[in-house]
């Protein structure tokens, strides 16, 4: 039997010693069976959430010249504005417009590893109040995400600080502000890919659904797509491939996608926050208690072979450092940035060679 809805967990229960054990049991069940959940009562002020949404939507109303002044390909950091259709997932164009931000870092030095290019200052729009709102939100979300990963650790029988070694000065939380135009604006009949089927990369990510539109879908174990509609007062949490690898498959990373809004529905907005880890770290599986791995084996045996549109690709030991893996994935998703900066052509050529050997051809990005 596979899941047919996404569970909702109340984070305030984890902050009360009397209700915390029940919360951890529910969290463990969700990690093993679903890998996707809503959380409510996060502690992020509602006034800040409202400001984040308002400022995010207003950004896309800026004149094109103001947005292009902070275009992603202006810098080798993969931070900044991406025009409609400039990102690729599973060799197809994602029909979305977005701004990528991160927690603050100074410019990398000349002797730093290449992946330190990712650790750089943001390109900020000039909108009054925008930077202050988003810096506040990212700071609060960073703290909350570390709290949540400590709860994941406890839920699967590890010490609360089991993941702390992945958080240091080269840790970079990331955030996207995303606009998905509807099919009428795109001039498309039927369906369009807002973002293609994928699994998130690292530990956990937290999505603020910033408009009333449906579109986010999660793939269950039978291959069916389950709606994950907006629910007021919640964030959607996705378990990343890194978390699945670290926990020996106990925490499930689940495939998800976004469909473009229907004709006449207007644009959908979302603001995902991606918990970062140290780019200098390597991933090695943790010693998860046998009682929990036995539960994992029981769940896997019960549900049988998993039908999944996206293969699990995160392999411990595949990369010298997590930063190298992250840089590779950024170049893969944003080939226009990879083409522009002379540090990246060898990596981009390797990606394209691998795709050609596998018989894949990526859709062409829009010109301009």
Swiss-Prot record:
Q: At which positions is Fe cation bound?
A: 198, 200, 256
Q: Name one Pfam family in it.
A: 2OG-FeII_Oxy
Against InterPro entries, the record matches this protein to: DIOX_N (IPR026992), IPNS-like_FE2OG_OXY (IPR044861), IPNS-like_sf (IPR027443), Oxoglu/Fe-dep_dioxygenase_dom (IPR005123)
Per UniProt, which keywords does this protein have? Dioxygenase, Iron, Metal-binding, Oxidoreductase
- Highest taxon above the source species: Eukaryota
Under Gene Ontology molecular function, one entry of this record is:
metal ion binding
**Which terms does the UniProt entry file under GO BP?**
small molecule biosynthetic process
| Positions contributing to 2-oxoglutarate binding | 268
Q: Which residues form a coiled coil?
A: none
Database matches in PANTHER family: 2OG-FE(II) OXYGENASE FAMILY, PUTATIVE (AFU_ORTHOLOGUE AFUA_3G14880)-RELATED (PTHR10209:SF812), OXIDOREDUCTASE, 2OG-FE II OXYGENASE FAMILY PROTEIN (PTHR10209)
Q: Which family does it belong to?
A: Belongs to the iron/ascorbate-dependent oxidoreductase family.
What is the protein name for this chain?
2-oxoglutarate-dependent dioxygenase frbJ
What species is given as this protein's source?
Answer: Dothideomycetidae sp. (strain 11243)
